[in-house]
């Protein structure tokens, strides 16, 4: 390997073993990189975040001593090159010639994919200690930023598991617990989030700090070191189709060049490898987000090998050190490619950035509009993500009209109204590809890819899509938006964030109200109830002291609370500051016009939630983690995690809310189900997600909600219930002329009148239709849904709600079960005739819209139509609430997450029977 500087500590001197002989713990890695930063004049260490468990996240800036002394100038040069419009050709050439290229090398974002972090130690030591000329040259020409361990909390969980399962003799069986790990595994962070899907949702502190750090450097190369199945070999970029159309063509070309040069090194060593195959590049939420900002992004996927090695299918044993070496050699090869081609890559980077702001470029004539919302907390969260990525936006100072805007349903509006207060995000700016990737309503998928996907689906039911095909941020957040085919510039002003966390007081106040449109209002209510404050909720829009309040508004009524007003106000202020809500005092209890009065039926008294969350083996860790995180960070209240395996030995009377996340595998036992059923009947609110809900819908007599496939014998009854819901929402009476007639009418219309003419399918036909359509369910697409605006679960939720769905169970509800959210949005069309879609009928004068974004085959749209996504039903003194999927998917589906927040916090008071405690 050459000569090494003895003044730099060897890894073994700190770890106690050679790199690759064992798995280094997070504490060992942090100790070693900090020691190296102190010893070497070629490295600076930067702490960019802390994990939930308090572990430091660092990156090392590695370069020549000269470059490190000029880092401020280098960063300034990079900043100028990233915004080159004001630079002339000579200045650009001069900056490129004097600026080292940057590379960001990142490892082990999944904590149980360990070899990457260990290989980073080999890389760092080699760069700092080697005295070979090629390394010296590399550091003269490059600034190398190494993030050695992106998920220390997950790695800590993994290394602990390995220690616990290590035996006296080496174990090379990939099926053993030493290699597989155990639930909840080390993949995710403390809250079990997959951090590799968090690069633009930025839910976690690891991601927020990392994004901020990466973005200030604009690395020309970004490496992401992973592991895959134990019996695979080694994968690296480039990806195969589908490839996101917003990735610049030059990056695809450079990806191929880097791959050829890396492959040459592997060929010399006779190491197996491949590119493409399962690796596609449509979803922009991995570390590949850096591509949209100008980086060549290269994924490493090493076949997983825990410490003892793996016996492979050819009979050889692959050691852990080999796995570490593969990633080390890859890194050196890629860094040399960057050094070799850096000037040309820099030139392409600048050309691309220039094209993003060109008046006739690809992104010149498009803007995205976020329409005004009363949900200030959600809008602020959305804008924070734009700020984090350096995306510019403004606000309209007055209303205007734009031509040919497209809404979430894909409808083109010839003259669309853009109200005052709308957020305008022009696509023509330096981060144009990223803006387009995360805000465009539909990612383009070529006909060739669609054909291959269709063929694969029909052959064996599989997919060539690796992740979701929809991720539009406005849809994920449940914010109404428009795509406008023009560069909007009129009547724009800087956005001013509304006041938050304060109280607008008034003399002789009788109550304090927080508007229920804001998601933060739910956490505000939960925190107050945790402090034994009596809280009410407004079940209908209200108007007091000239202030309008949305349904779902939170009311602290002095009449209800025996606490001294000053002490009560202290608690209110603290909760307001913690959640960022604005509190308005009122001294008038009489509602204006026919709106609610403060002592009437629309002011419902809430019950403090006592929350339990089912956990342990078989539970989907991502669903569990996202709910756990939501309760901790948004509600800020105590709750308990219960092992479903020990449920029969527990006293469930302590809880009035139990949340059952979706499952990876297994089912609840019969005894667990019986226990939960009795608990519900005694007043509990049971909230069940995904596959867990599917199991309970299948249980005889547990729930009135059924699965679509089990209801075709009674399809007509479900269709009648559907019509009844629709008719109950109409704003006019169609047979008004017959109401006051004295003669009995003989020509009345009934819901089944249309059915007779349309000749719906019989049970056998419906079963065949369903069996065929099941094959085409999406792997992740955004669909339109309609919400029951009279139901308490939809507080803070708009009438039309985007839902990210996949092959989730489809629920059917009638009679005593409420379909709170159904798939499909009905829009008026006078020319539309009544249509039969599967089991259901679309009323005359209406079109039904399903697809918003992503790949949904027409067969799947039909199957989804009018099925229920969210149901609520009373059972005894309690209730059952079922979600068809994970409502807080990746912590980013804010629209559906609000439904879950409402269920958890408001359920005990609004959906279950409360008891007056004497």
Identify the role of each PLM range.
Residues 149-152, 162, 225-232, 692-693:
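Short, solvent-exposed turn/loop segments enriched in Gly/Ser/Thr/Pro and often Arg
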Residues 86-90, 97-99, 154-157, 173-184, ...:
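Well-ordered mid-protein domain cores that form the structural environment of catalytic cofactors
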